[in-house]
């Protein structure tokens, strides 16, 4: 009788859920912290602009989005 070969490696039933992951904290340089603050502010401004457009005319925004190939 022929045996079936799975062709792959067998897996053991071991799980890594029990392993603890060590928390690592690093301090960013002042330049990195400043750049992070600038990017965060830019993103917040962009999100505020999107919110205002949606509050004013959400239907037109959605219609334009769908016409451009969005789902």
UniProtKB/Swiss-Prot annotation:
InterPro entries, alphabetized: Ubiquitin-like_Pup (IPR008515)
Superkingdom in the source lineage: Bacteria
Residue ranges the record marks as coiled coil: 31-60
One Pfam family hit: Pup
Biological process terms in GO annotation: modification-dependent protein catabolic process; proteasomal protein catabolic process; protein pupylation
Region annotated Disordered, chain positions: 1-42
Sample GO molecular function, one term: protein tag activity
Recorded family membership: Belongs to the prokaryotic ubiquitin-like protein family.
Protein name: Prokaryotic ubiquitin-like protein Pup
Organism: Salinispora arenicola (strain CNS-205)
């Amino acid at each position: 009788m022929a045996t079936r070969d799975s062709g792959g490696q067998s897996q053991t039933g071991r799980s890594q859920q029990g392993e603890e992951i060590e928390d690592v904290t690093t301090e960013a340089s002042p330049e990195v912290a400043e750049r992070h603050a600038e990017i965060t502010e830019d993103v917040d401004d962009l999100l505020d602009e999107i919110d205002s457009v949606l509050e004013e005319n959400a239907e037109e925004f959605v219609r334009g989005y769908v016409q451009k190939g969005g789902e």
